[in-house]
Amino acid sequence: MGRIQIVYSPDENVSGRTNRPGKEVVDPRTGRIIKVKRETPDDYLNVLKPIKGPKRMEFNPYLPKTLTPKGYAKFKLMMNVASKQYETLVKRLKTERTLWEDPDFPANDKAIGNLPDFRERIEWKRPHEINPNAKFFAGGASRFDIEQGALGDCWLLAVVASISGYPQLFDQVVPKDQELKGPEYVGVVRFRFWRFGHWVEVLIDDRLPVRQGRNTLVFMHSNDPTEFWSALLEKAYAKLNGCYAHLSGGSQSEAMEDLTGGICLSLELNQKERPSDLIDQLKIYAQRCCLMGCSIDSSVMEQKMDNGLIGSHAYSLTGVYPVNYRGRTQWLMRLRNPWGDSHEWKGAWCDGSPQWREISEQEKKNINLSFTADGEFWMSYEDFVTCFSRVEVCHLGLESLEYNQNFHGKRRLDEAIFSGQWQRNVNAGGCINNRTTYWTSPQFRITVEDPDPDDDDNKCSVLIGLMQTDIRKKVGADFQPIGFMVYNAPDDLNTLLSRAQLLTRSPIAKSQFINTREVTAQFRVPPGSYVVIPSTFDPNIEVNFILRVFSQTSITEQELDEDNTNQGLPDDVIEALKLEDTLLDEDQEIEQKFLAIRDPKTNAINAVKLGELLNNSTLQDIPNFQGFNKELCRSMVASVDNNLTGHVELNEFMDLWIQAKGWKHIFIKHDVDQSGYFSAYEFREALNDAGYHVSNRLINAIINRYQDPGTDKISFEDFMLCMVRLKTAFETIEAHPKNIEGTSLFSAEDYLRFSVYI
């Protein structure tokens, strides 16, 4: 079914179309000049799609799939306000000659959070009050600048240290040209973080927590007492997460994603779960567009061990290199402790160990070997997998880097991203265990066209991440168990896989279902097309989500959907009705009843008479159905009343009668327990059985409009009301004039008349 175009004209009777709102154009049918006054463009739904260009990919996952033109206008207004927030605030503060105090993150114990040791022992001071020579940067950012404070956020420190060495990553998070003194200084600092699918700017004031009576920063700080960018960055991240306390004991993977926009994969190193080809994977990751970190599980926070390593502590994995050692290849891992001090590995290949004497000077030069107490050290692959618990790998994609930027000499990975919401009774079908509802879950098709260039097995590495909105730290809610299934896509697939198709297919890959912010899994598959189905574990759980797919080679993506079409009652339903009429002979009887009650002047009946007729027929023989009421009968009249007379003639009635019997037949099929209701999850299948195929956006509107909010079910009355209104809508659109593109053209008056008479 084509689109609808409403065109306003001076006399409200002339229809026309233009691609440019606000211009005078000539109506191709009348030759008259008309003026178009639309506020929302034809392609407004394109804002739901990611923008892929030379810059970082732009995407707003908070826009609902059900976006309307009114919603679009509100969204544009909000975006304009948000984009000017920083400039507007700075301008106001300069006019008022005041320093900003952030009302959303006040300088008090609320910002500190649940850290009892610091309650009422903190003062808040601005950088110039802590050090009169305070600067945002002192000689530029470096991974050796940063020191951890009293907060257990070494995981954040490790990632900040890692990205500080790469301007293409660091400058996105820490905007340049920020000063802590001078005519432009107003006490406002800004940072950017990637959050649930897009980059957000976080504004903070520059008041920082210091120990009472001393000018020493409590939390993250620079080893240069005049430099404050790292302390302010930590504060902005604390604001994003609710308070400083929420930064204690996090994971590197979360910080990696929030500071790069990449997607993280966790690799367990214990012997049972360790991949058999781990060293090959690490070699490839070291050569790809990736950041890597690692950690050691320990029951004691930051436990210092005899071998120089620290338990429950995050490290950066900065390199994987082979060296020739005693005639064989020895793989070495280069790591860095974010504390940047002498707490380093003390075993084989540590700084100054005898093993290095047997390595050629050229090889030492090739790997930039140096021995200083800077927290950076080397160890063998064998010791690494024995001592460490996991590796976290962050793959950088279209949201992480601009088109002309690279990382380790490698281009960013290709990326596809989808956003959605699991909605109760619509598409929150749960996992495959829920056989009657699983098929309603969102479906996305991806196509990977070429195998990986850095191996020879003719397969593609595909990394899939499913993320749910992070409300845990904001409102204390728990994450829901989420996961996804991957299926081979039929060659001709352009619409949703049906319930029957899904229940007879086996997934080629699947993730675990875990109650974490994000679930990721990596697969190696031949080039081709695949269907990814994300879901919660249980049905009827409402959560916003984004689904991301990364690959070294190009990806094409499509949200699977149906076109809005009316194909009429299927042949099997028509045949069933013929058989039924042979047995009951009701068609002739109902025709005689119509003739008996018609108005002799018009040979037609109104909605009241229609109700009397239908309530004395077999159509009303449905459990718990209270009969054809006035509202339902009015809509039934409207569905066949082509000239808006408010009456139904005999031929119109008989057409409606046949269709109504077909709709009743379909309702009974889905009302398996003969209760007079069926589940809202079955509505789409019932519509398909009636010949109506509707899009994801339309089924959402239908279910929200016609389900019983108390039972989450569809009654016979609401089902019939939906059927007749869909009939009216489809036939109105099909009958209306169209342009060369198949878009239906409505004047404002026509649209309003059909909207109210339905």
UniProtKB/Swiss-Prot annotation:
It is an enzyme of class 3 (hydrolase). It comes from Schistosoma mansoni (Blood fluke). Residues 658-693, 694-729 form the EF-hand domain. This protein binds calcium. The active site is at C154, H313, N337. Calpains are calcium-activated non-lysosomal thiol-proteases. Residues 398-562 are annotated as: Domain III. Belongs to the peptidase C2 family. Pfam families: Calpain_III, Peptidase_C2. Keywords: Calcium, Hydrolase, Metal-binding, Protease, Repeat, Thiol protease. The lineage of its organism: Eukaryota, Metazoa, Spiralia, Lophotrochozoa, Platyhelminthes. One of its GO terms (cellular component) is cytoplasm. It comes from the Eukaryota. Residues 563-582 are annotated as: Linker. Ca(2+) 1 binds at D641, N643, T645, H647, E652. Its EC number is 3.4.22.-. Activated by free cytoplasmic calcium. Residues 583-757 are annotated as: Domain IV. Residues 99-397 form the Calpain catalytic domain. GO terms for molecular function: calcium ion binding; calcium-dependent cysteine-type endopeptidase activity. The keyword Phosphoprotein does not apply. Ca(2+) 2 binds at D671, D673, S675, Y677, E682. GO terms for biological process: proteolysis. SUPFAM superfamilies: Calpain large subunit, middle domain (domain III), Cysteine proteinases, EF-hand. This is Calpain.
